[in-house]
């Protein structure tokens, strides 16, 4: 019986693909070597310890229907579209070795006519007249008895969108998370015009088979053809939940400030696990009571635009004379935290 397993995803859903990855990693036999090839439609994927409000322009992501997905490995934030090919290598210990999987990807690129090399801990680069250009980034995860190496290859990604979603609004945001490093990148299509996801996947598969000296049939998976994986439904539900993607953010503080015709407002929030643990309101308004009441109401709430907006609008019943101000405040808060 082969010790290899090859999975190909037909789904562009990042939550589906990451749930598949998680289930296989947890349940694979320690003697198995797994290759999983996949790609995501418009998604910002953040590292396990990152703060989405710090790393991402969450408001623009919402406007453009870009998903947020938190992975289980560390590292920085990346933007995925269908111009990225994603790969995951898994193996039990002591065989797990990220240098082996890196060598397989480099061999695949070489077979396509691209000479690349490893740079630092996480990247693959090609040398150009303008210097090294990054074509692949990776992240890793290890447990007591197994490990995985996953990463992306830039084929024909819309690089202009990296800045759209990975550069947050310039807010007074202080955080304890990890800040992403955004280096010079290049698409493989610049070196190999017409290169496709299918060609890259086939090259990686062949390099995988060649390294281990055996072959195996691919398992093609999709939401309509889900793999037989115990607890997959529960894993997918967690992977797609707000509590995982946003609520797992490291503790941070956020300061919002704005001047309205009726006065200036400062809101100070301390947020842990996606919930407000402390809220303070400061204002030079002649009627500060609604803001003081709002600060008290927000403690314990999820740090979500719609939740904060609802809490603000709920105060209209207590302060009907300030209805116009509260509605204006509500709209501003909703926009500021998205």
From Swiss-Prot:
Stored PROSITE patterns: BPL_LPL_CATALYTIC
GO cellular component: cytosol
Subcellular location: Cytoplasm
Positions in coiled-coil regions: none
Record bears the keyword Transmembrane: no
GO molecular function: ATP binding; lipoate-protein ligase activity; lipoyltransferase activity
E.C. number: 6.3.1.20
One GO biological process term: protein modification process
Signal sequence region: none
Keywords in alphabetical order: ATP-binding, Cytoplasm, Ligase, Nucleotide-binding
Anything else known: In the transfer reaction, the free carboxyl group of lipoic acid is attached via an amide linkage to the epsilon-amino group of a specific lysine residue of lipoyl domains of lipoate-dependent enzymes.
Described function: Catalyzes both the ATP-dependent activation of exogenously supplied lipoate to lipoyl-AMP and the transfer of the activated lipoyl onto the lipoyl domains of lipoate-dependent enzymes.
Name of the protein in its database record: Lipoate-protein ligase A
Species of provenance: Klebsiella pneumoniae subsp. pneumoniae (strain ATCC 700721 / MGH 78578)
């Amino acid at each position: 019986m082969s010790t290899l397993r090859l999975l190909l995803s037909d789904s562009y859903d990042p939550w589906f693909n990451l749930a598949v990855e998680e289930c296989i990693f947890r349940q694979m036999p320690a003697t198995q070597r797994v290759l999983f090839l996949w790609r995501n439609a418009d998604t910002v994927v953040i590292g396990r310890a990152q703060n989405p409000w710090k790393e991402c322009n969450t408001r623009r992501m919402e406007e453009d229907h870009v998903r947020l997905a938190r992975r289980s490995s560390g590292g920085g934030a990346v933007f995925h579209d269908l111009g990225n090919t994603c790969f995951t290598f898994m193996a039990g210990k002591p065989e797990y070795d990220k240098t082996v999987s890196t060598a397989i990807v480099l061999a695949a690129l070489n077979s396509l006519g691209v000479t690349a090399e490893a740079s630092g801990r996480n990247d693959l680069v090609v040398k150009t007249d303008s210097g090294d250009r990054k074509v692949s980034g990776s992240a890793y995860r290890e447990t007591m008895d197994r490990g995985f190496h996953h990463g992306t290859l830039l084929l024909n990604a819309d690089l202009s969108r990296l800045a759209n979603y990975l550069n947050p609004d310039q807010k007074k945001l202080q955080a304890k998370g990890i800040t992403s490093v955004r280096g010079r990148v290049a698409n493989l299509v610049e070196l190999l015009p017409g290169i496709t996801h299918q060609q890259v996947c086939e090259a990686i598969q062949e390099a995988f088979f060649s390294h281990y000296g055996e072959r195996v049939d691919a398992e093609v998976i999709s939401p309509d053809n889900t793999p037989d994986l115990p607890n997959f439904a529960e894993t997918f539900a967690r992977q797609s939940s707000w509590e995982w993607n946003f609520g797992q953010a490291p503790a941070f503080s956020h300061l919002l400030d704005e001047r309205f015709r009726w006065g200036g407002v400062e809101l100070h929030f301390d947020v842990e696990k996606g919930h407000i643990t402390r809220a303070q309101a400061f204002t030079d308004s002649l009627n500060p009571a609604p803001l003081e009441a709002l600060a008290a109401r927000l403690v314990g709430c999820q740090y979500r635009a719609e939740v904060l907006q609802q809490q603000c609008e709920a105060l209209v019943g207590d302060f009907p004379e300030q209805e116009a101000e509260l509605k204006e405040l509500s709209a501003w808060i909703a926009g500021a935290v998205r």
